[in-house]
């Protein structure tokens, strides 16, 4: 075991990274060596068992906890670890497999006090809390001391407070850094391996950044240079963390600039992140990891500056001169407690443990922790989002949660996908989660199914069982995109989250998050939320000929720019949507599938979430279809069948008594943007390479196009029919490389049945497996330096391909561009659009599974499990 491990250490050192944590097999080998240690290896073996085994309910932690438990019970021995030391080591494992033994040791005369000391600083107790409380009631002195310690918050008091002054060195990245810069999509396979993945951070050369190996290894020399000044380093930018929700972006920043977590291998916490604007999901992920994220004007900071930050006073000064650079206000005073506790999640869990212990002991509420400042009640009405969150928090019907209020809404639906799923699995293990508390947790395999690496194949084989044994639902590789499936599992007016920034429910509301917070939501069934303000977008009038929903998606940033509420320039960036909820009304004849195109794109606005006012009939039709789909899934052997049936029954219950929340007429919004559909007379695109840079077709027409992509969660079956109708009229091939990727296998099947795949083949299109395809850029990519029209979600630099120029546009405009080999004039486009408009009723039909015999019969014949009410 040691020989193989040392070889691994050498291989990793050659890559410039630390060794991976021990797996279960290696830990089992280590256990045998600890029982009979080779001479001279004693210290090394002790270090491995102490510091290189993951905590929680990891498989290796199971082996470690089993061995240490056997020692304290006298069932095993090691000359290096006595009973006392074994109990202490159990106390370093955070929670999960170590807890039962530590609680039992409270009855052991020899080790009770040692076990008590460990439990006093263990937060992940869950149901084992009651085992300690029962012992305390029966007079167990050690258990009493544990309960009292929890009640007094000793776990929190033992940690140092945030200092009055922080002296830091600036690592400045000018302009906008999105999460793809920090955690590049082509390197997604390595995300769970934090040290290895971190090497790719900022690997593309840009202003002020010099990668060691452009395209593969980031600016390690610059990082070492700022560290050499001897102070902790702050990551600083103009706009930081836009784009995907990936926690791997935070992990990479903290790997270089954070602090080691005692007894936890290959993971760091703490650190500092400052930005003129910090995207909301990235901000929350930093919070969860124990970092100190602060928004202030960073214009006058440069790479290598040494600054003094005064977190309580709210000012930044130059270390040498004392010159005030800028001032700031913390988003919430609770942030300082979060940093002290090691993160927002440890604070929430620990605070809950303290409250529980105080209630058990008959004590009043603790005044140890900072409380969020409750906003003044304006007495005005509530928005739709505020009412949805209010219901999820158990408030009286019709009551909402005011912006600025801290709350913990119930998570009804949680989604996870395959490039974040392995990290979510690790986080769930760290949280000692063996069963989900959220009502429905779904895992997809849409980002890696098409062109899997060996590590992806391993994930495809192992992650489904991990999810299903905890009561979750697992899709299969090739099924299609997470959102296209998860949307069909939603309940109206409920709240959820997902480990993908495009988890934007078209019914209800979701607050997408990084994998740590997603794991917390899945495990506990709630999620911490500082309720954001809302921005209302109100459409009026009638949709003009040739104008698509995607044009309305892009009209939102276009109109915001015209009104001075959004700027494309990164310095002094203005974005009215950032961190707020986008609420949309006025499009009263949308289907739910169409509504998702609008809610989905709220991610590109950096909005915290989105709601859309939809008619009751549209939602009822959608749920009827989805009940059939869920029972078809049960018949097809998808699991967990009880979770699927429970959700189907909840949909039936809503249909039996349909009702929808509505915004009050006097609800308050941070801004109201009115868009008259009569004024949107030509297609609106987003120009390279910024989803905020919305432009009219007439301003960019004529640009030569090399490649076209029609796919992503922004598309549905109607878009592929529209493209097919246009392509069918082409004689011979097309002058562009055309990629087509339907969102689900059901769409692909239906399009095949209707003959569209034959049309695509005749046109020379490259057909991709249902799923994300080019959109994330982690597998197949467009040609370097090409100009592309894409229906995908984002057009950040280097996302679809290296050095590409990408226009975001509707499927209809994308299809026309593929035929012409250029962006058409408005007149050219309208000539094609006229044909589509004349066939709209046939083209824009959506999948109603309750009306498709194959699905209806399979659902009727499925073996439905009994579900407890």
Curated annotation (Swiss-Prot):
Uppermost EC category: lyase
Which co-factor is required? [4Fe-4S] cluster
Q: Which GO terms describe its biological process?
A: propionate catabolic process, 2-methylcitrate cycle; tricarboxylic acid cycle
Q: What residues bind [4Fe-4S] cluster, as annotated?
A: 713, 772, 775
**Chain positions recorded as substrate binding sites:** 191, 244-246, 417-419, 501, 794, 799
Question: Which Pfam families does the entry mention?
Answer: Aconitase, Aconitase_2_N, Aconitase_B_N
Under Enzyme Commission nomenclature, its number is 4.2.1.3, 4.2.1.99
An example of a Gene Ontology cellular component annotation for this protein is: cytosol
Q: Which family does the record assign?
A: Belongs to the aconitase/IPM isomerase family.
What is the protein's name according to its record? Aconitate hydratase B
């Amino acid at each position: 075991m040691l020989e193989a491990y040392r070889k691994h250490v050498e291989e990793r050192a050659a890559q410039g990274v630390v060794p991976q944590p021990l797996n279960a097999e290696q830990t089992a080998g280590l256990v045998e060596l600890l029982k009979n240690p080779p001479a001279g290896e004693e210290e090394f073996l002790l270090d491995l068992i102490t510091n290189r085994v993951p905590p929680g309910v990891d498989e290796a932690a199971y082996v470690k906890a089993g061995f240490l438990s056997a020692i304290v019970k006298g069932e095993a021995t090691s000359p290096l670890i006595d009973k006392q030391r074994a109990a202490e080591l159990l106390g370093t494992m955070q929670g999960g497999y170590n807890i039962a033994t530590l609680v039992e040791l409270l009855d052991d005369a020899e080790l009770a006090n040692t076990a008590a000391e460990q439990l006093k600083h263990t937060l992940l107790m869950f149901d084992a809390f009651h085992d300690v409380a029962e012992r305390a009631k029966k007079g167990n002195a050690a258990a009493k001391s544990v309960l009292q310690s929890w009640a007094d918050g000793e776990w929190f008091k033992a940690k140092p407070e945030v200092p009055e002054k922080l002296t830091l060195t600036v690592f400045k990245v000018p302009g906008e850094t999105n999460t793809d810069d920090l955690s590049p999509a082509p390197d997604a396979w390595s995300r769970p391996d934090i040290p290895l993945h971190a090497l790719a951070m900022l690997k593309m050369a840009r202003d002020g950044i010099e990668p060691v190996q452009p395209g593969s290894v980031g600016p390690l020399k610059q990082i070492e240079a700022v560290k050499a000044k001897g102070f902790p380093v702050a990551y600083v930018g103009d706009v930081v963390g836009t784009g995907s929700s990936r926690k791997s972006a935070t992990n990479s920043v903290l790997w270089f600039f954070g602090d080691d977590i005692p007894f936890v291998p290959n993971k760091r916490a703490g650190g500092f992140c400052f930005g003129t604007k910090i995207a909301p999901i990235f901000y929350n992920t930093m919070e969860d990891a124990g970092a100190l994220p602060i928004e202030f004007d960073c214009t006058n900071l440069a790479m290598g500056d040494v600054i003094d930050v005064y977190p309580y006073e709210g000012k930044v000064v130059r270390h040498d001169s004392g010159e005030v650079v800028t001032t700031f206000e913390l988003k919430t005073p609770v942030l300082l407690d979060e940093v002290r506790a090691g993160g927002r999640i440890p604070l929430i869990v620990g605070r809950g443990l303290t409250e529980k212990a105080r209630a058990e002991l008959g004590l009043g509420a603790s005044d140890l922790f900072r409380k969020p400042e409750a906003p003044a009640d304006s007495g005005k009405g509530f928005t739709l989002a505020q009412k949805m969150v209010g219901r999820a928090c158990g408030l009286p019907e019709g009551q909402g949660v005011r912006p600025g209020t801290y709350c913990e809404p119930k998570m009804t639906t949680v989604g996870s996908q395959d490039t974040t799923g392995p990290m979510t699995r690790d986080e769930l293990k760290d949280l000692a989660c063996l069963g989900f508390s959220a009502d429905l947790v779904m895992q997809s395999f849409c980002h890696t199914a098409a062109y899997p690496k060996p590590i992806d194949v391993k994930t495809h084989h192992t992650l489904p069982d991990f999810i299903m044994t905890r009561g979750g639902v697992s899709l299969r590789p090739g099924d299609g995109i997470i959102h296209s499936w998860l949307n069909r599992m939603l309940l109206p007016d409920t709240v959820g989250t997902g480990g993908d920034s495009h988890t934007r429910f078209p019914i209800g509301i979701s607050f997408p998050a990084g994998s740590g917070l997603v794991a917390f939501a899945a495990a506990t069934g709630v999620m911490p939320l500082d309720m954001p303000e809302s921005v209302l977008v109100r459409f009026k009038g009638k949709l003009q000929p040739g104008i698509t929903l995607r044009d309305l998606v892009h009209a939102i940033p276009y109109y915001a720019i015209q009104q001075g509420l959004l700027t494309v320039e990164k310095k002094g960036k203005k974005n009215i949507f950032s961190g707020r909820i986008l609420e949309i009304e006025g499009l009263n004849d949308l289907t739910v599938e169409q509504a998702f195109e609008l809610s989905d794109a709220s991610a590109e606005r950096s909005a915290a979430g989105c709601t859309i006012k939809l008619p009751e009939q549209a939602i009822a039709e959608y749920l009827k279809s989805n009940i059939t789909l869920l029972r078809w899934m049960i018949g097809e052997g998808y699991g967990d069948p009880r979770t699927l049936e429970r959700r189907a029954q909840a949909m039936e219950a809503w249909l039996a008594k349909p009702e929808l929340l509505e915004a009050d007429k006097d609800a308050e919004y941070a801004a109201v943007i009115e868009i008259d559909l009569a004024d949107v007379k030509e297609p609106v695109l987003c120009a390279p390479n910024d989803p905020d840079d919305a432009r009219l077709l007439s301003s960019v027409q004529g640009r030569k196009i090399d490649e076209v992509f029609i796919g992503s969660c922004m598309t549905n079956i109607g878009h592929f029919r529209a493209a097919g109708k246009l392509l069918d009229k082409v004689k011979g091939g097309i002058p562009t490389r055309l990629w087509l990727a339907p969102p689900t296998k059901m769409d692909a099947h239906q399009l095949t049945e209707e003959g569209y795949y034959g049309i695509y083949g005749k046109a020379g299109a490259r057909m991709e497996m249902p799923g994300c395809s080019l959109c994330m850029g982690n597998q197949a990519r467009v040609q370097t330096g090409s100009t592309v029209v894409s229906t995908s979600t984002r057009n950040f630099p280097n996302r679809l391909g290296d050095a590409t120029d990408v226009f975001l546009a509707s499927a209809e405009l994308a299809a026309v561009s593929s035929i012409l080999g250029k962006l058409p004039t408005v007149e050219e486009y309208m000539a094609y659009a006229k044909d589509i408009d004349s066939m709209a009723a046939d083209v824009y039909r959506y999948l109603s599974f309750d009306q498709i015999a194959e699905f209806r019969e399979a659902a009727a014949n499925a073996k439905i499990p009994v579900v407890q009410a």
